[in-house]
């Protein structure tokens, strides 16, 4: 395998180009109806930990397809004129996702430093997520 960029270099690049919110600021943004939080975590993480109330769940592996209006998997929510705030468990996936969304043409993007773990530790609101039936 030819050596390429590692995840650390990719995170450094992303963090240099995107807006990063500390948790207290993110909690304030959560009160704004123009802001949509996007949860990138795996469904099992949501079921185990809960999520930010009102967040839209977009698994990280589907994000490119859900954002692109030309994709058969496009989700109209990503065409809305909203401020998108991405988050994951610890802030790495969300930094990369915010950079990706920005590269794909979404202008108002940010991510939560420290992710859901930091949000929860700071006492941010948390909603319970019901386990989906039919799965293991």
Question: What is the role of each PLM region?
Answer:
Residues 38:
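Active-site flanking residues adjacent to catalytic metal/cofactor-binding acidic residues
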Residues 1-35, 43-83, 92-136:
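Rhodanese-like catalytic fold shared by cysteine-dependent sulfurtransferases
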